[in-house]
């Protein structure tokens, strides 16, 4: 008997992988932003909808990785409950951004804009000055 073709959309645990930012926006029901000023050039980009409520975009290039999340509301959507030794607050585009990581080598940023919550994690820590331009580049 013929093997059924795999559909383009894989659904597991409420996760749906799609192929573009536009499809991701449709899947979650709001316009999804993306990280456009990462400290590395992404060779691979993966788009995932979680439960039709949270957008996740994963960026990768070799060992360098970034994970961007956007959801409605003001909840921390990072899924990262680690205790970090260092935390710093800065204001970017009028939003209060919390950086977490090692002293002057932060790997996680969390912020809200009044409508959406955002988080961005990096595999390699960056100083606050670099994070400022990374967060400014989320559009």
Regions found by a protein language model. Name each.
Residues 114-139:
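Surface-exposed amphipathic alpha-helical segments
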Residues 2-117:
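Short, solvent-exposed recognition patches
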């Amino acid at each position: 008997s013929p093997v059924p073709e795999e559909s383009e959309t894989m659904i597991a645990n409420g996760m749906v992988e799609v192929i573009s930012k536009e499809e991701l926006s449709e899947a979650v029901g709001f316009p999804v932003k993306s990280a456009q000023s990462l400290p590395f050039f992404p060779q691979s980009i993966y788009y995932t909808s979680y439960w039709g409520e949270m957008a996740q975009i994963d960026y990768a290039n070799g060992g360098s990785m970034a994970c961007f999340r956007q959801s409605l509301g003001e909840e921390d959507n990072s899924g990262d409950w680690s205790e970090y030794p260092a935390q710093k607050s800065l204001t970017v585009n009028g939003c209060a951004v919390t950086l977490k990581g090692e002293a002057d080598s932060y790997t996680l940023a969390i912020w809200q804009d009044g409508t959406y919550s955002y988080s961005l994690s990096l595999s390699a820590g960056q100083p606050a000055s670099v994070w400022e331009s990374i967060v400014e580049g989320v559009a």
